Amino acid sequence: MAKPKKKMKKAAPKARKAAPKAVKPKKPAAKAVKRAVAVKAAKPAKKISGRKVADVVTATTRASVDLESSIGRMERAAVRKVGEIAARATRAVRDAISPPIKLPSYDELPVRAGAPAGAAWGVFGDDDEVGTINLLTPERVIAATSSIRTGKVFALNLPINIPDPPLFTRGKHTHTVKIFPNAEFVLDDFLDNFYPQASSQWDALAHVKHPIHGAYNGIPDNQMTGRGGMRLGIDNLARRGIAGRGVLADVARYHERVGKSIDFTTAKSIPLEDVQAALEDEGVELRAGDILLVRIGWTKFYLSASDEIKAELAKETVVPGIEGSERTARWLWNNHLAAVASDSPALEALPKPPGEEMEFLHFHMLAFFGMPIGEMWNLEGLADDCAADGDYDFFLTSAPLNIPGGVGSPPNALAIK
């Protein structure tokens, strides 16, 4: 009888490996991505025809060329724009230095038949009422902005109550401040007996006429005052505005350097050569359309003077100033200045020194040239800054009061460095 087979014992199971760490269930989105990748891999890759490759290369090349072309157009446009700006700036500086229309020299005046010798009547038109301010063209105004270097601003007006007492027999104004009617929280004020030329000022072209030849451009008296009209008034300058390159001739500092002095209680005439030497010493050149400011030191003297001296000057105004001669007038015109202002009360010496009685510079400038005159400007702060940095040119603006037919106005002038 066959022996029954023994049951084989099952081998002991091997030791199980350590259970793996629990893995966070993957997000459904990740599984979906995995399935999509698997399906993509399972599908046989489509063959790309050579034609499609060529089309892609062509399209890419065209896009690259278009991009380069666009960049090139932009670069060329930028270069053109910069060139246009540079050309405009070059023209502005060129026009500022040399007027686009050649002006006659002093010895070539007059240009209008019947006008007196040395008169610029008709140069700016037979009906002109602003004279040499016409030289402040847009091109020159743009060029003048290059004189702004630091952004410093200097106000050139004295307070309207200085000089005190007023000079040249002018009256003293009164200033009244009052509460506005029916509004106790509002103040109002007004001036009585206000003389627009009692302090820092512009002389309008109507201010002085030649005793024989009359006013600028031959405009008759009956068109300047009364019912006949108000021509040559300060309103002409006010409506236009004054802006351009200013240049300071600091004659007072030049005198200090060379050991000269001025007695401000006398009518001493300062030679033209001193003005020219001051400009040369500063290293600044005049250009057509410049507004020349001449500092002789009078304002500094007056502000520190005693009450007795101020009272004496009010009683009899005796002041120094630049030489009031025809050669000075010739120099001013030949430099084609737009205007001239000074810190002195009359620009020139008054009363007229011996030998200069009939050479009143106001006749030449206002009546013959149409060149506005500024007087009693406060140039002290500006002069100190120019001496400190060595830059004697600046951008100058002035907004006279719009007084119809007025013969003068505070300048409301600013020098911007």
Language model regions located:
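Extended amphipathic alpha-helical heptad-repeat regions
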Residues: 1, 50-53
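Low-complexity, polybasic segments enriched for Lys interleaved with small residues
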Residues: 5-50
